[in-house]
Every structure is written in C-alpha cells, then in structure tokens.
Swiss-Prot record:
Gene3D superfamilies in the record: Ribosome maturation factor RimP, C-terminal domain (2.30.30.180), RimP-like superfamily, N-terminal (3.30.300.70)
One Pfam family hit: RimP_N
Protein name, as recorded: Ribosome maturation factor RimP
Subcellular location: Cytoplasm
Keyword check for Isomerase: no
Gene: rimP
Homology family: Belongs to the RimP family.
CDD domains: YlxS_C (cd01734)
Gene Ontology, cellular component aspect: cytosol
Function recorded in the entry: Required for maturation of 30S ribosomal subunits.
GO terms, biological process: ribosomal small subunit assembly; translation
Length: 204
C-alpha cells in the first residue's frame, strides 16, 4: 500500500534517507515535498507520535536531516530545506492518520471520479481494512458513511474547527510546550493554513 507522505520518485528517495534520521530522534515524517522554482525547496513536515512538536525540535530535525543529505547528496542543484509541524489543519498522509483523527472534519480528494465526484467533505469515521471511512451529506439532513480505498486518494486534509483547535491545545498542554498566544492568533485567522512550529529555512 502506498501513502501520501512522498508522491514522486525523488520524494520517495529523499524520504528513504530522512525517515530513519527523523524516527531515530523520536519523531515521525508526516510529509515530504521537493518543490521546484528558481531555487528548489525541500519541505519536510514532522511531528511527535502523540503530536505537539515545537520550533526547537524542528530546528534539531533540520540540523540532523541536513547532515544526512550532505552525505548522500541526492539533490544536484542548490536547495532550501524547510522543516515545520503539520499545522492544525494538517494533511492526512498515512492510513493510520484517518484512524487517529476519527470524529474530526476533513476534505478528501481522489485521483479518479467516484460516483461522479473527486472531492469529499465530511466527518472521518475511522478505517476498515484498506479503506478510509467518511460520513458525508446525502441530501438534506441525511448522511451516509462511505469507504474510499486509501490508494485512491490524491490529497486529504483536516478542516479547521473549534473542536480541532481544542484538541491541539490539549496536545500542547500534554507536551508541556503550551503557548496560548499561538492559539489566539490562529482563532483570529481561522480558515487559513497555519503552521504551529516552523524552523527558518536552511540553504544548501
């Protein structure tokens, strides 16, 4: 079974290099993308297994990953390394994410049309085998839970809600790295993507 952590061949190669480094530090790789542009950017999202990664930890990951990439040297041209948290409205990139975030709202996009549509919005209802379960509207005041094979997914992301913010607050408090001011800012800019912890870019 594939996942959405690394999509392209070069992304998967880079993930093979950095995943052991990140996991060896006690974190998890959530997503990796090598972005094109005038200067290429390697974007890495990482988190604690129980959530709540902070800026200093992103900095530690950046230093360790940078050293590993300097040894392997898989990117020929100059690039910028960015390490951040997944943010509150985080991407869902692994099958287990849909189980962990059961009960929260999400948007899912599939690679092919399913019953005439590619986009689904609803409440996550866990997993069943290799399927992601999501409860969606089926007409006025009517809901149905459908199963989407994980391999069909092109993109998936949590929707920013008060319930989700409350859960992130709980994770922050549990980790001992709680800064209430961060969440004041998030509530003011609700609907915009917000990274909770981001390490300043490192150029290579």
């Amino acid at each position: 079974m594939s996942d959405l952590v690394a999509k392209t061949a070069i992304d998967r190669r880079l993930a093979d290099i950095v995943t052991p480094v990140i996991e060896g530090m006690g974190f998890e790789l959530v997503r990796l993308r090598l972005m094109s542009g005038k200067t290429r950017t390697l974007q890495i999202m990482a988190d604690r297994p129980d959530g709540g990664i902070v800026v200093d930890e992103c900095a530690e990951i950046s230093t360790a990953v940078s050293a590993a990439l300097d040894v392997e040297d898989p990117i020929e041209e100059n690039y910028t390394l960015e390490v951040s948290s997944p943010g509150i409205d985080r991407p869902l990139t692994r099958l287990k994410d849909f189980e962990v975030w059961t009960g929260y709202e999400a948007r899912i996009e599939t690679t092919e049309l399913i019953d005439g549509r590619r986009r689904f919005k609803g409440e996550l209802a866990g997993t069943e085998g290799d399927e992601v379960l999501i409860t969606i509207e089926d007409g006025r005041d009517s809901y149905v839970t459908i199963g989407l094979k994980f391999d069909w997914l092109a993109d998936a992301k949590l929707i920013l809600t008060e319930e989700l913010i409350a859960e992130m607050l709980r994770q922050k408090k549990a980790s001992g790295n709680f800064d209430e001011s961060q969440f004041d800012e998030i509530e003011e800019s609700e609907g915009e993507e917000a990274d909770e912890a981001e390490q300043p870019p490192t150029k290579h």
